[in-house]
Design a protein with these regions (language model features):
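Positively charged n-region of N-terminal signal peptides that target proteins for export
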Residues: 6-14
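Sec-dependent N-terminal signal peptides
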Residues: 15-23
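C-terminal motif of bacterial Sec signal peptides marking the signal peptidase cleavage site
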Residues: 26-30
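Acidic/polar, low-complexity intrinsically disordered N-terminal segments immediately downstream
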Residues: 32-112, 261-309
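Auxiliary, metal-adjacent structural segments of Zn-dependent hydrolase domains
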Residues: 91-152
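Short pre-active-site segment immediately N-terminal to the catalytic Zn-binding motif
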Residues: 158-177
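Active-site recognition of the HExxH zinc-binding catalytic motif
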Residues: 171-191
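Metalloprotease/metallohydrolase-associated module, dominated by Zn2+-dependent proteases
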Residues: 203-278, 284, 296-304, 309
Length: 309
């Protein structure tokens, strides 16, 4: 009868609903009882070496600087073919940078009692070492170091250095580091705009590459690169005064001619006054400290990097 057919249809619907509820409940129960398996990725922090612990104490905690010696593609310019820095060379360079750059400023400020946290505050936050050199394809010039917006300094050709050759260290690294650090400082506190007018007619964004050192001196530049533009000129004066050996500055002035020597001396005097007025940096005292420390590098190279220093 029609009524019986209707009853059968309703019973089928009830059974289907009941079956669906049963199966769903079973699936939920099964899922709740399953345990997540171990990750296929290694989630354990990498083991720290004795060198890593030394960097943690002497760079991260002391100066808030991340000293990277392992090659990381996220940090490096991958348009170049890079080779990782050798660990032993990295250890020596880490000691030298701390002793010859960071601690030189510390020693100067300790004498005056001001700006004791200067390097912790203003030094670049990342120092990255690359074992190989980098060649600029557009100019075929070798890049020894570079900086990115005052945050990171990249030092190349680490595997080729002789840690005891101070002249090589200055050419490869410390001239670059003082150069880039001076950029950081003048970007925070501007130097006098009058400086830009001293050699205004002789700056050339590309022509500087064709000038010899002597030609640059006679135009009033301490290096050919200083003739690129005023800001580079300003920081080159500071960097070269700090790292060049005794006698270099006097020889440069003697060979620059009357006009060139006068321009270089005027630039130096302005840079010296600005460093003292803006940052309490006595550039002559700082240079004295750097030169003295340069003569004692051997004394720190063989120091052990122990965890109980």
């Amino acid at each position: 009868t029609p009524d019986n057919n209707e009853i059968r249809k309703n019973m089928k619907k009830i059974l289907l609903y009941a079956l669906a509820i049963f199966l769903t409940g079973g699936m939920i129960s099964s899922c709740s009882e399953d345990k997540l398996g171990d990750s296929i990725f290694d989630t354990n922090p990498p083991a720290r070496t004795e060198f890593d612990n030394w960097l943690l104490r002497n760079y991260v905690k002391e100066y808030n600087i991340d000293f990277k010696y392992r090659l990381e593609d996220i940090e490096a310019n991958m348009s170049y073919n890079h080779i990782p820095a050798e660990v032993e060379k990295s250890k020596k360079l880490a000691k030298i940078i701390k002793y010859l750059w960071l601690e030189s400023y510390d020693e100067m400020f300790d004498k005056t009692g001001v700006n004791k946290d200067f390097m912790r505050t203003y030094a670049p936050k990342v120092i990255l070492l690359i074992g190989s050199s980098a060649i600029n394809p557009s100019s075929s010039t070798e890049i020894l170091g570079s900086a990115e917006e005052g945050i990171k300094v990249v030092l190349y050709k680490v595997n080729s250095i002789d840690p005891t050759d101070v002249e090589m260290l200055n050419e490869y690294y410390f001239e670059t580091m003082h150069h880039e650090f001076a950029h950081i400082l003048h970007q925070k506190k501007s130097y006098p705009t009058e400086y830009n007018q001293i050699s205004a007619a002789d700056y050339s964004s590309t022509g500087w590459q064709n000038r010899t050192e002597l030609q640059a001196w006679k135009l009033g530049f301490v290096t050919p690169y200083a003739g690129m533009q005023p800001q580079e000129d300003f920081v080159e004066v500071i960097a070269n005064y700090l790292v060049k050996p005794d006698g270099f500055w006097e020889n440069m002035l003697a060979n620059a001619g009357t006009e060139g020597a006068a321009k270089i001396q005027t630039k130096f005097d302005m840079a010296k006054e600005w460093l003292m007025a803006s940052w309490s940096i006595d550039i002559e005292e700082l240079r004295t400290i750097i030169i003295r420390r340069s003569e004692n590098i051997d004394s720190i190279l063989n120091e052990k990097m122990t965890d109980n220093e």
